[in-house]
Swiss-Prot record:
Keywords: ATP-binding, Glutamine amidotransferase, GMP biosynthesis, Ligase, Nucleotide-binding, Purine biosynthesis
Pathway given in the UniProt record: Purine metabolism; GMP biosynthesis; GMP from XMP (L-Gln route): step 1/1
Organism whose genome encodes this protein: Natranaerobius thermophilus (strain ATCC BAA-1301 / DSM 18059 / JW/NM-WN-LF)
Active-site residues, record numbering mapped to chain: C82, H169, E171
Protein name as annotated: GMP synthase [glutamine-hydrolyzing]
EC number(s) stated in the UniProt entry for this protein: 6.3.5.2
HAMAP family assigned to the protein according to its UniProt record, in alphabetical order: GMP_synthase
Length: 510
């Protein structure tokens, strides 16, 4: 099934993924490729439009990202953003210079020549700038779109060739009319049809898996998280009972999580599920280990051993299902993968397993996986479940892991989640969890001195986990959470709220 494609050429800008996501929000399929993709490869992909991203370089800097001028002669619309606009201007005969006044932050754009990109947008437009170089003279055939106080040419366009450039970042929320301008580019200029939906994605993906994998066996390592759950359901729709999910309980799950996952898959989805309680095995391996990277390594290696043992019991397995996302594909620097590909030593799995991969989510961002989950009829509890790391509570118990610490943390986590669900805030938060530090503090309970653990609450909002901001609870809510945790969780006498954003902190503590 062919679909319209918009390509974002990545020049190293921090917003390249955001551009792709904004395009997809308009039901237009979009992929990111490196700026140095060959012109032949680009033509093979047959995009309906191209977006040139921003980037940290100067167009005159030695070794700065460049592109083939033939891109502008293919005959399809091109939109250059920030560095992308400067490069377009330079390659087509304009002049770019280092600006004496760098422009960072909000600016007011005065539109001098209205055009298809600015249609329906008011003349004085708030935009977000982040640049040093500026276009001093537009290329032949181009017009100036508008200016800001410090940038005389803040946008340019050639209506005959459908080439447009903006010095500002229309993809960020700080440019309020940016989405409208992007919509104008996609539909007024590129004449796209907005036919890419999660429903069509499901249909297309299931058919592709059916064609290549029907009648052959596949296994899926299930975590209970949304990625592996949605991946498993898509594959089950394609190959039915030939899929077996393996759910390894490493003893580091949240309260009652193993029961919830088993009930969901065995009763509601009727998927073949192998449940392995390997909690003692994992905890024995982790005894005395305090370094977070060592914890991750031990858990990863042990998971592989358990998974391999169970997969061999099934016998004659051809495929391994993974919940790889498009962000993983982009980060690895590879081109977009097909749903099914040949692969050895997957995630450290021994080469002799000789499995091919099925990755039904490798074209999707995290928020799109949630949309697919809704299309598949998954409950809100699963769809909006907060992200949970592979090593589980091992990296939320700081220092050495013991059964006592895990029990305390599980209970605290359950109490916080319960309270926030009661008052209707749980689903407003992107990620929420508690942390148990490797210290005890003095307190008073009743008339007696206590010496117990503190609990740290971490709650953040984010779009993709790359950056995050701490959630602003009211003082009343924090007081309720503190009272419940300290009174209901044995071994805790202090409650702390982490108000650090990412960056400088990471979301997880380890």
């Amino acid at each position: 099934m062919s679909r319209e494609l918009v390509i974002v050429l990545d020049f190293g800008g921090q917003y390249s993924r955001l551009i792709a996501r904004r395009i997809r929000e308009h039901n237009v399929y979009c992929e990111i490729y490196p700026y140095n993709i060959s012109i032949n490869k680009l033509k093979q992909l047959s995009p309906a439009a191209i977006v040139l991203s921003g980037g940290p370089s100067s167009v005159y800097q030695e070794g700065s990202p460049d592109l083939d001028t033939e891109i502008f002669e293919i005959g399809i619309p091109v939109l250059g953003i920030c560095y992308g606009m400067q490069l377009m201007a330079k390659k087509l005969g304009g002049t770019v210079t280092g600006s004496t006044k760098r422009e960072y932050g909000k600016a007011l754009l005065e539109i001098e020549n209205p055009n298809l990109l600015t249609e329906g947008v008011s003349s004085d437009l708030l935009v977000w700038m982040s640049h040093g170089d500026s276009v001093e003279q537009v290329p032949p055939g181009f017009k100036v779109m508008g200016k800001t106080e410090n940038t005389p040419i803040a946008g340019l366009f050639n209506p005959d060739k459908n080439l447009y450039g903006v010095q500002f970042h229309l993809e960020v929320m700080h440019t309020p009319k940016g989405r409208e301008m992007l919509k104008n580019f996609l539909f007024n200029i590129a004449d796209l049809s907005a036919d890419w939906t999660m429903g069509s994605y499901i249909e297309e993906t299931v058919e592709q898996i059916k064609t290549e994998a029907q009648g052959r066996k596949a296994v899926c390592g299930l975590s209970g998280g949304i990625d592996s759950t949605v991946a498993a359901l898509l594959v089950q729709k394609a190959i039915g009972d030939d899929l077996t999910c393996i759910f390894v309980n490493h003893g580091l799950l949240r309260k009652n999580e193993q029961d919830q996952v088993r009930e969901l898959f065995e009763q509601e989805f009727d998927i073949n599920l192998v449940y392995v309680d390997a909690s003692d095995r994992f905890l024995n391996k982790l005894q005395g280990v305090t370094d977070p990277e060592q914890k991750r390594k031990i858990i990863g290696e042990e998971f592989i051993r358990v998974f391999e043992e169970e997969a061999r019991k099934i016998g004659d397995v051809d495929f391994l299902v993974q919940g790889t996302l498009y962000t993983d594909v982009v980060e690895s620097g590879t081109e977009t993968a097909s749903v099914i590909k040949s692969h050895h030593n997957v995630g450290g799995l021994p080469e002799k397993m000789d499995l091919s991969l099925i990755e039904p989510l490798n074209s999707l961002f995290k928020d799109e996986v949630r949309q697919v989950a809704r299309e598949l009829g998954l409950h809100r509890e699963i769809v909006e479940r907060h992200p949970f790391p592979g090593p589980g509570l091992a990296i939320r118990v700081l220092g050495e892991i013991t059964k006592e610490k895990l029990d305390i943390l599980r209970e605290a986590d359950a109490v916080v989640s319960d309270e926030l669900k009661k008052i209707g805030l749980y689903h407003d938060i992107w990620q929420l969890f508690t942390v148990l530090p490797d210290i005890k503090t003095v307190g008073v309970k009743g008339d007696e001195r206590s010496y117990d653990y503190p609990i740290i609450l971490r709650a953040v909002n984010s779009e993709d986990g790359m950056t995050a901001d701490w959630y602003r609870f009211s003082n009343d809510v924090l007081e309720r959470l503190s009272n419940r945790v300290v009174n209901e969780v044995d071994g805790v006498n202090r409650f702390i709220y982490d108000i650090t954003s990412k960056p400088p902190a990471t979301i997880e503590w380890e």
